[in-house]
Amino acid sequence: MKKIYTFGGEQVERNITVGDIITNKQNNIKMTQVTAATQEESEIVSSQNIDMIITGSDWYPDVRKGAPNTFITAALFAGRFITNEEILRGAFDAVMGGADSVLTPRSYEVVEMLANEGIQVQGHVGMVPSMSTKYGLSLIHI
């Protein structure tokens, strides 16, 4: 375990840090990440030595209770956080509450906005169901 300070200044222990993730990526070391939405799920995940958990920002407090030392990313749901101000507020709420990073499915500019505030942020590359109405099929969002 590594002793770190959260964005909000609380000293905690974490299984990995962003620095570890970068080093592992550079050295082609695979890591594991799963989704958890409840305290019970995160307790199970934590007991299995999964490297990282991803959860919705609304579920983060319960998930953290079940995995106090696991690196957790709080996803900012696109339909809940619409404006840049709402996205920024949601991200700050998550990291001030102890989340290790946030994920957003928004634009590169939004990712950059969060990074410029010192928030560890992941973009999202994946299926975009909302685009299937426009194009008649599911698309990969890059």
Indicate residue ranges for each PLM-predicted region.
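Conserved N-terminal beta1-alpha1 strand-loop-helix module at the mouth
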Residues: 1-67
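Hydrophobic faces of well-ordered beta-strands that scaffold small-molecule active sites
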Residues: 32-35, 53-55, 72-76, 102-104, ...
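Generic hydrophobic/aromatic pocket-lining and core-packing "Φ" positions
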Residues: 39-42, 60, 84-87, 91, ...
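Alpha-helix-loop-beta-strand connector modules within alpha/beta enzyme cores
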Residues: 59-80, 110-130
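Glycine/small-residue-rich loop that forms an oxyanion/phosphate-binding "nest" at active or ligand-binding sites
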Residues: 70-104
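Acidic/polar active-site rim loop that often engages polyanionic ligands
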Residues: 131-138
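Conserved small/polar residues in nucleotide/adenosyl-binding loops
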Residues: 140-142
